């Protein structure tokens, strides 16, 4: 809902102070530059917030849901405009809609020596003159708001107070009591300070009401409170609790038994993080909650609204004890042993036989089970075909823009006799081009993302199965056998099938993103295509829905097998390979469903191990 205390912006006056303000890039951005998440692409336009507190909306409509809040002096990036609204990106990366009246556009770099007044009290009044009694405030601004410093006055208002003359983003000037602000050079970073100071600062807001989307003492939601505490201590966290839990590079995993005051606890269900609190020690937390009297509270962790829903703990990077690791440990040897036992149990309960291979591409640690068990490759064989195409593009003997004739006629591996394949829904985009031509890039993409057998046979006929096999061998995956086109019944009858095992397919997937035998451009293209996969019911479906992980993968499914081979890229940039090959599940839909469900459970278990402290 919209905050009724949000003041309207005023028409700007082009004063020298306003000109200085227009030159301000944003105190917030430079102040927190080192602490901010990875920067988005360069903005086309920037603007400064002119309202004391302004709601951001999910749609260009002030009756829509509130997504976030921004405050005076913050800088936003303009993404698009519509009638009376702009779609903006905040410094923390949140994208939402804001009324145009709350913006001052035309932001350019700040002049050298620019100083700002940053509000440090819960609220500060800005007056037209240096007096508490001469007139009502022009506006009241919350902690964290920033204004350009113009002058410092020593008790010139007769109020036994020193005053600071400031420039407001809408072009006006005013006065604020010096005790309510910190005067800082534009370039200066706020100090991280200590957990005791974070906690003391957070307790200043006790009793502030719970407000969905709120980030100020007028009202906080749970993540808005945490973000404000750390923002005023030099750390710009992501806006939402699930983002902080899984996607924020400034936070690292920590075990519950190693919690320190100032650590963050995240709560929710197995598939949704929707609350967070700050650990105070002695079983107490600081939170903004809807329970009890909705607002900022100090609460016991073991309350029925918290302890049963605890999921993860995180620590601000730089707050660990000396010598303690500040990262997820990934797949250590000890963890690999424990994880192998978990995966073995899931496989046993599924009724299927699984070939499993897991490798942490950062630590190099791996685990496997039945990883040399050879199975029909099904459509997983299409990844080696793609890599041979990309190798040839690197060599200059093919181009992804080459136009390839599209026809449903292929030669059997056995005797060269012609055959055609039965066309399915996955072939529809390629089928539309029958009798014409399609680019090699189109065919390779369709081969992977929609698993088109028509596209596969066209590409494999172009590059040759023997060449695919030679490059697959060179990539360290000789147990992956690419022998023939799809639906070559004569070859099938003679037992000439495409085959794989989990270890070999893991080597192929790792090569797709890491092998020096492919150029960086080729690896990037392989990732782009694999990450565009449209069949996502196994490994991707097992990940936490809010994880922020991206999966590049290829599935394979025929009557007797159910496969998924992947590279999973975590938000912190780490990658791991996960290959799950299943057969002997009864070749019926119930057996297949159990195998798919087991693959999802294994995927979740591997992901949990990779993000653990």
Please provide the spans of the model-predicted regions.
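Boundary regions of SH3-family modules and the immediately adjacent low-complexity/disordered segments
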Residues: 36-44, 89-118, 131, 157-201
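Beta-loop motif signature
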Residues: 39-42, 48-78, 119-156, 210
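SH3/SH3-like beta-barrel superfamily modules
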Residues: 66-99, 139-177
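Aromatic- and glycine-rich peptidoglycan recognition patches
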Residues: 131-137, 251-254, 280-329, 582-584, ...
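Catalytic cysteine-centered active-site loop
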Residues: 209-224, 228-261, 523
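Structured C-terminal helix/loop/strand segments within mature extracytoplasmic catalytic/sensor domains
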Residues: 320-346, 462-464, 507-538, 543-546, ...
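Beta-lactamase-like hydrolase cores
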Residues: 326-373
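Mid-domain, small-residue-enriched loop/turn segments at the edges of structured enzyme/sensor domains
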Residues: 353, 436-440, 444, 450, ...
């Amino acid at each position: 809902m919209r905050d009724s205390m949000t003041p309207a912006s005023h028409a700007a006056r082009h004063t020298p102070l306003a000109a200085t303000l227009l030159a301000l890039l944003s105190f917030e951005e430079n102040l927190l530059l080192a602490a901010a998440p990875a920067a988005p692409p360069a903005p086309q336009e920037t603007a400064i917030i002119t309202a004391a507190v302004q709601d951001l909306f999910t749609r260009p409509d002030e009756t829509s849901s509130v997504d976030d809040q921004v405050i005076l002096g913050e800088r936003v990036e303009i993404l698009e405009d519509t009638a009376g609204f702009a779609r903006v990106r905040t410094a923390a990366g949140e994208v939402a809609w804001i009324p145009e009246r709350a913006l001052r556009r035309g932001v350019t770099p700040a002049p050298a020596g620019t100083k700002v007044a940053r509000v440090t009290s819960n609220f500060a009044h800005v007056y037209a003159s240096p007096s508490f009694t001469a007139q009502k405030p022009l506006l009241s601004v919350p902690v964290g708001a920033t204004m350009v410093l113009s002058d410092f006055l020593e008790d010139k208002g007769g109020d036994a107070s020193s005053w600071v003359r400031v420039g407001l983003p809408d072009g006006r000037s005013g006065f604020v009591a010096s005790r309510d602000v910190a005067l800082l050079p534009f370039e200066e970073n706020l100090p991280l300070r200590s957990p005791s100071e974070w906690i003391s600062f957070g307790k200043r807001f006790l009793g502030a009401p719970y407000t969905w989307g709120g980030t100020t003492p007028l009202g906080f939601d749970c993540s808005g409170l945490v973000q404000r505490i750390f923002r005023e201590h030099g750390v710009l966290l992501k806006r939402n609790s699930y983002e902080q839990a899984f996607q924020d590079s400034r936070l690292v995993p920590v075990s519950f038994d190693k919690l320190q005051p100032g650590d963050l606890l995240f709560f929710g269900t197995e598939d949704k993080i929707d609350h967070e609190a700050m650990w105070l020690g002695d079983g107490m937390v600081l939170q903004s909650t809807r329970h009890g009297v909705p607002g900022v509270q100090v609460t016991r962790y073991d309350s029925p609204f918290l302890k049963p829903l605890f999921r993860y703990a995180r620590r601000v990077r730089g707050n660990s004890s000396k010598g303690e690791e500040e990262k997820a440990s990934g797949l250590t040897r000890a963890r690999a042993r424990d994880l192998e036992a978990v995966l073995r149990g899931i496989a046993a309960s599924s009724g299927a036989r699984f070939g499993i291979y897991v490798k942490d591409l950062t630590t190099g640690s791996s685990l496997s089970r039945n990883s040399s068990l050879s199975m029909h490759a099904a459509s997983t064989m299409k990844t080696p075909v793609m890599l041979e195409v990309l190798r040839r593009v690197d060599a200059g003997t093919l181009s992804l823009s080459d136009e390839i004739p599209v026809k449903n006629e292929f030669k059997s591996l056995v005797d060269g006799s012609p055959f055609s394949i039965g066309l399915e829904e996955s072939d529809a985009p390629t089928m539309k081009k029958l009798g014409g031509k399609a680019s090699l890039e189109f065919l390779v993409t369709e081969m992977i993302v929609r698993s088109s057998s028509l596209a596969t046979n066209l590409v494999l006929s172009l590059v040759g199965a023997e060449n695919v096999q030679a490059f697959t061998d060179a990539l360290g995956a000789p147990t992956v056998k690419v022998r023939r086109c799809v639906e070559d019944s004569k070859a099938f009858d003679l037992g000439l099938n495409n085959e794989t095992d989990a270890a070999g397919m893991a080597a192929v997937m790792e090569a797709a993103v890491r092998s020096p035998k492919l150029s960086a451009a080729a690896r990037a293209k392989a990732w782009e295509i694999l990450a565009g996969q449209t069949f996502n019911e196994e490994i991707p479906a097992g990940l936490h829905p809010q994880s922020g992980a991206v999966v590049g993968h290829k599935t394979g499914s025929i009557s007797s097998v159910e496969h998924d081979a992947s590279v999973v890229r975590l938000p912190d940039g780490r990658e791991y390979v996960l290959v799950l090959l299943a057969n002997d599940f009864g070749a019926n839909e119930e057996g297949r469903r159990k195998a798919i469900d087991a693959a999802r459970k294994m995927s979740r278990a591997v992901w949990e191990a990779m993000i653990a402290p």
